């Protein structure tokens, strides 16, 4: 079994931002040389998430609206008593997956027709990192 690890780094420009990262993750899978296995993708931040869904603008906006209804920006969170102001970002990250594991088949991500990988940022405007770990077998 082989394990290959790389990190994605980028800057988010908005407090709340969905970043389509499928092409970058696919490139890491190709560079790994792994033919069959799994690709683990996880943000290295507690106010962010990784999820798989359709890359359609209306749906992305709907996800944001849904998350804001479930975890609105609100000054009354107990977390804010510590001097922080991002409790809603922590809660939104909990509602989406903190990480995802994707199948790798024949050296490529094995995604459905409309499946795409996203980094979801809820406390942005700074440099961010995502770990991508590909594990599996290399066929000769």
Explain the meaning of each model-derived region.
Residues 1-140:
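Active-site histidine-anchored catalytic micro-motif
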